[in-house]
Amino acid sequence: MGQKTNPNGLRLGIIRTWESKRYADQKDVPALIKEDALIREFLNENFSKAGVSQIEIERVKAKSKERVTIKLYVSKPGIALGKEASVKNKAVSNLEYLTKKEVILNIIEVRRPEKVAVLVAQSIAEQLENRASFRRAQKMAIQRALKSGAKGIRTLVSGRLGGAEMARSEGYSEGRVPLHTLRADVDYATAEASTTYGILGIKVWIYHGEVLPGQSILDTRKPFEAGNQRRGQKRRPRNDQPVKDLNKEKEIARRTNYYVNAKKN
């Protein structure tokens, strides 16, 4: 029987890039991989309330000292920064002590967390841990993702659903999610929810569009980052009011006065 592979790994090197980038000798690679795992574990634990969606680590050797540049994508940058960037500075100092290298931490805001698979899976897991209905949690996540500009979404929850004695899987799907098309930008993530009846597994697939030759993965997600307007449509500023047609308003006022005078007579 054919099994479903991880869409992120299947598209790695085709339309997706690596989240860890380094130039090192072959003998140093195992230690750097272990160090990257420690960095990711530290950031996920300390910034869990900020909604971490992605961590990119890039290593550059500057003169005699090695520099580690980290891009932390979060949905709540205010929590990640803290008052006067106190939380960020504390994290940088701890990472420098952990790695014994210079660390640069860049916090980037995720503008549309409703269509990021990692954050959607985490949101469903939190609702299930708070005893919410697994059907309602999935349907609400699908509605928010489609409203934010996703072209397709699929969710799946597995385990003792509703406290049943026998475990089963139940999921929902809306739109297109082409898993066999390699140029299709499919975002995939998993999460776990710890409930009184055991652990529930959550899987989320979100389709953003096709990445054509000469484009990057950002081009499929960029048109909807600023809002729900269509491709190529400009958003009107809040203070920019539509121009009033004075002649039309005068005609409406004249007709209103005419009917009022006619009723009086």
Curated annotation (Swiss-Prot):
Top-level taxon of the source organism: Bacteria
Coiled-coil residue windows: none
GO BP annotation list: translation
Keywords, in A-Z order: Ribonucleoprotein, Ribosomal protein, RNA-binding, rRNA-binding
Segments forming domain KH type-2: 39-111
InterPro entries xref list: KH_dom-like_a/b (IPR015946), KH_dom_type_2 (IPR004044), KH_sf_prok-type (IPR009019), Ribosomal_S3_C_sf (IPR036419), Ribosomal_uS3_bac-typ (IPR005704), Ribosomal_uS3_C (IPR001351), Ribosomal_uS3_CS (IPR018280)
This protein's record includes keyword Ribosomal protein: yes
Assembly information from the UniProt record: Part of the 30S ribosomal subunit. Forms a tight complex with proteins S10 and S14.
Stated family: Belongs to the universal ribosomal protein uS3 family.
Known role: Binds the lower part of the 30S subunit head. Binds mRNA in the 70S ribosome, positioning it for translation.
Protein name as catalogued: Small ribosomal subunit protein uS3
